[in-house]
């Protein structure tokens, strides 16, 4: 009887121990943010951060297939862990295995170039377009989009009062079904980068239509802008995509620290009615993102908003605000902020639509900036000429430009129809404008003594002044 009793106790103890071990094993599993997952692209030839959660205080072993090395770290009391390791040159596929008592594996990892793509609706606009707002030639481009070397990740729209630690999204290979739903601007950017470099490219899109610049910023960066009302509680969030800080918290914060090459940005339409602070605010956003990432002065390329008749969305009885002031503010930023560049879209707007269909133009101009300024491509022009000054000789204004080594051109003619001049009365009149190498000569019979000149400084304009094939931004010499 005693022997039987002891055997029963031993069996009971063994059963309890097995159940405990099984329970611990079930809980002992590394959890990773959504962007650390199968099919991801990791930035090549750099130090990358990996992070996640595991069993509190447990050791975590990370094994990488490209160097067959095992790295060790330890989760803290809350289960959080972080580790930095080196990545090889472009290639793959590779795997990473995580072990804290239970194995977790990321498969089909490619090493290549990783870019973050952010902004509002013109960045968000998918290849399939919006209702009654198609993307030009998208059907053919979608049909031909299959490319296992191009990987896509879209962050789900998330607005939050407090900073989040993860996003919702999955990595997808570029095939017609996935490309159709993906950002058109980002796709055309990534496609050109991948084709020209012939290495894997990953694109992470974090965008929300109608979002304000302030929504993508940390509250500390907005202290210089008292008009930006930072929410003090959930009740203060009156708009999920415009309230300051809410998209930084919900969509950007979880990505901070992810090793990448740089950022492309297409935003500004929501800020057109408060343009006077945009250059300062956008510059603060770029500096803030760079400081948060702690990856140096990474490239930041952005689109200037395209021309559109904002009178269409102006309430009856209210003055129509000229969005050229916002374009002017955007143009200031590339001269203030290092390692940045602006894709001018003055020839790619749509009078009756705020979402122009020329997304290939936008994406590929951003890609040219990256190819030349980041990847060192020679023989290609990536930056538009820009206005540097004017002088008056008799009744003619002589306008000068920089970044115009091949002179200014108007494509199929030698004159521009978008210039105006004004005298001391500050009244602008249409002017005749013709090319003289890298300068423009401008005059109007109605202004015998000009003191100011403007080009394309209207809500909607069809840009007709170029340096090679890149349009000159709208500009003005005055500050009236």
Mark where each language-model region is.
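Cell-envelope and extracellular/periplasmic
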Residues: 29-480
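Bacterial Sec-dependent N-terminal signal peptides
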Residues: 1-29
